[in-house]
Amino acid sequence: MDLGLKGKVALVTAGSQGIGLATAHALAREGALLALCARDAAGLTAAAAAIEAAHGQPVLVLPCDLADETQIGPMVDAVLARYGTVHVLVNNAGGPPPGPSARLTEADWQRAFQLTLMSAVRTTNAVLPAMRAQRWGRIVNVSSYSVKQPIPDLMLSNSLRLAVAGWAKTLAAEVAPDNVLVNTVAPGWTLTDRVGQMLAARAGQRQCEEAAVAAEILAQVPLARFADPAEIADVIVFLASQRASYLTGTVLPVDGGIVQGAL
């Protein structure tokens, strides 16, 4: 299936590892022109080199801390200076730290607000003028199944990702007349470094093996396994494509069936 992404300019935030990196590979495979940003400049450079080697596609590398509002504008300006426009934006960011409400400080909340919600708002606001002018755009937010079913011990993530979903739903209606589509992907448990860290932290708290924690999680997943980041990326790339031309304002779980609700 031709997804109609050849030659489209795609900006992927937090693109040096995990779901972001898998999405970058999938977009490059479709012939998109890539720009990647991440805090870790060395990791970002290595990711870009791997993509270029695998797919023969040049990658614009943009070190950027998404929680710092002063860095997002110049990052997007660099994409526009190189490519002239942006067709696809994948809003992805590392999740906020775990923990119950009693352990969270005001600073924890402020950092999570900037990283999880405002990074998506600011990056989107920076690319929207180009998308609206060309009357074609795809914005895909990478969230979590916690927007459908809160995950214990993830107070910050559960709260702020719901804010992203509400913002995205509202924005989708505002920009639909300009053929800019806004959707959110809600992954389930996926084999990323962040999930590995969460498993290790839970095992440490309970003084048990990580395998026991993983088994407890997978007992709740009908498919009985973790997702590969590439499986999430495939859905993101479809939503970013010409083929997803009548889909906007939705939250799409890609969760192995873990969400128990019917809707």
Regions found by a protein language model. Give the residues of each.
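Substrate-binding pocket helix/loop in short-chain dehydrogenase/reductase
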Residues: 100-101, 108-113, 139, 217
